[in-house]
Amino acid sequence: MTLSSDMSDVLAEETDIDVVGEEDEPRAEEEEEEDGELLMPRSPHCSSTKDPYKAAGSGGVGRSALVKPPYSYIALITMSILQSPKKRLTLSEICDFISSRFPYYREKFPAWQNSIRHNLSLNDCFVKIPREPGNPGKGNYWTLDPESADMFDNGSFLRRRKRFKRQQVPELVLREPGHFLPASAYGYGPYSCAYGIQIQPFHPHSALIAFQQQQQHQQQQARHQQQQARHQQQQARHQQQPPSLPSMAAPALMPPAAQDLSRTCTFYPHQLSPAALPPSLQSKSSSALARSTFSIESIIGGDLNPGPKAAGVPVISRALVTFSSSEAAAALGGNLQPGTVLTNH
């Protein structure tokens, strides 16, 4: 009995070991299945149902190796543009950078190329730069807007802080298609440390201020030139006037009383005394009175003695006395007798 009990204990231990070992039973079942497969002919339906599982198992290992990067398309485009020397790339160059850095996108190319194109066109943080006339190639360049430097949170491409909205720039700052942004426009402080870019930060409003100052300076120069041209024209007009008529050339420089006096002297050169005339006309009027005997008294037949008759002297129209005494004497042949009346023909 003792031996039988010992043998039973050993058998119990062996059975316990077999139950705990989970790998032995499937192997036995697989051996039985293989024996059954050897004995029984394999049907095409069974083989077709068993192959997809093997294929799925082999394909699952390949898919697990290609993990999609945790970056958005905007972050991928920003990475590619910042690593370029000129901070601008074409669509094909952006796709080449993403494919070379991330195996997932290398295997999925070109399925995601349209997504890159749409993100470039629809997001304001990307700016299109036309290709130079002398630079052959296909496609335009793309760069980053200088004001989108704080688009990502603390310079991390995993988190985007906010959606960038481009501000409306005045038309005065718009550049021609052949002109491009300066090199200082591509400096970004938050990203320069990660990519080894050491460029001075770009101030977007400096170009606008400089342009406005330049335009104001040009307008001031144009106004100054116009004033100089007007002044020269006025001087030329004064120089072209005949010097024999000082009363016509100098009224603007005389005081108002002298201007009225000069106009009166033009029509009544012999009614005024030489002392009341301007200095420029005193010598001329005195010489004319000395040469001619023509006077108002000779016309009206009065005498030279002042008296009560002087108060009744009629006023002669300005149209009758519009010529000098020398011209009147020449017209009458030098014969002018007292009592002769001149009429306007």
UniProtKB/Swiss-Prot annotation:
Quote the CDD domains the UniProt record gives: FH_FOXD1_D2-like
The residue ranges marked as DNA-binding region are: 68-162
Is the keyword Phosphoprotein assigned to this protein? no
- Keyword check for Repressor: yes
Role played = Transcriptional repressor that down-regulates bmp4 signaling in both mesoderm and ectoderm. Regulates mesoderm patterning by repressing ventral mesoderm genes and promoting the expression of dorsolateral genes. Can also neuralize ectodermal cells directly. Inhibits neural crest migration. The transcription factors foxd1 and foxg1 mutually repress each other to pattern the forebrain.
Just give the chief location class: nucleus
- Quote the tissue specificity entry: Expressed in gastrula (stage 10) embryos in the dorsolateral mesoderm, where expression continues until mesoderm involution. In early neurula embryos (stage 12.5), expressed in the anterior neural plate in the prospective diencephalon and eye field, and in the anterior neural folds, with expression becoming stronger as neurulation proceeds. At stage 14, transiently expressed in two stripes lateral to the midline. Expressed in premigratory, but not migratory, cephalic neural crest cells. At stage 20, expressed in the paraxial mesoderm and in the optic vesicle.
The cross-references to SUPFAM superfamilies, in alphabetical order and at most eight, read:
Winged helix' DNA-binding domain (SSF46785)
Q: What is this protein called?
A: Forkhead box protein D1
Give any Gene Ontology cellular component. Answer: nucleus
The record's annotation in SMART domains points to: FH (SM00339)
One GO BP annotation of this record = forebrain development
Ranges for the region named Disordered are 1-59, 211-252
Q: Name one GO molecular function term.
A: RNA polymerase II cis-regulatory region sequence-specific DNA binding
Q: Where is the composition biased (Acidic residues)?
A: 11-37
